Amino acid sequence: MLARNAEALYWIGRYVERADDTARILDVAVHQLLEDSSVDPDQASRLLLRVLGIEPPDHELDVWSLTDLVAFSTNSQGGSSIVDAISAARENAKSAREVTSSETWECLNTTYNALPERERAAKRLGPHEFLSFIEGRAAMFAGLADSTLLRDDGYRFMLLGRAIERVDMTVRLLLSRVGDSASSPAWVTLLRSAGGHDTYLRTYRGVLDAGRVVEFMMLDRLFPRSVFHSLKLAEHNLAELMHNPHSRIGATTEAQRLLGQARSELEFVQPGVLLETLESRLAGLQTTCRDVGDALALQYFHAAPWVAWSDAGQRGQLVGSQEES
């Protein structure tokens, strides 16, 4: 597979996941701000912007200014707004039409073309419908990719990108709650933002506890958005890309080593000590995500720099642009 196609598919996976996760987080935050008068809108908005890696403005924030920054801003710092993420996913799909299905392309293209109308409706009726639209389109894209794409290297690159983005987003969510009390309602907000509230309640029979929430989000083997599950998925797809499933010496590349090390540390950690070392462990996982991106760029993408949240917008969105220059 051409390096530009591999990289485009990898970033399609990341950008669609980024748009989906950002919509989920913003939707929960907006509901909280509108329904709970005890929450300070400016403080809560700044915390959310910090989670998403967006530089907060100097003026005071409310629901509407927060929505404009997170959902509708273009050329955002880090390319982390929902509109920018969808635009970038669509541009990458456009550059790799020969390795994507018509259905997945039409899904992204239709979503992109509907953004202006959906934005106007959101400013009249509120942001919930827009955010639900993004979540639904991301789910549709995932379903179409699952049902129409060959299980080849391109599909594996897309899943690899999605898995790494999920690790990064879950880590950011947990970092925002470091230092909160065990009984803080913010833990419920975290679970809702990750789409795991109902699953958590079924798993732990409705008992809300900070330690269990951290265990669930970090270690659960069955919840698809947990850090462990996402690392395992990334590690599996990278191993499939290596085309050497029976290697007698284990990890042969830097990306494999980094993912395997992060996964094994979580696999054998004592759950009871997670809260005690949470901040340092999360910081280490963020570093791992960045280093894995660098290693993949060197190994597969002709050493193209990894697009971090802080410089994604400066990348120009279209992966293939470097090939053309």
Task: List the predicted regions and their residue ranges.
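Alpha-helical transmembrane segments and their helix-helix packing motifs
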Residues: 1-325
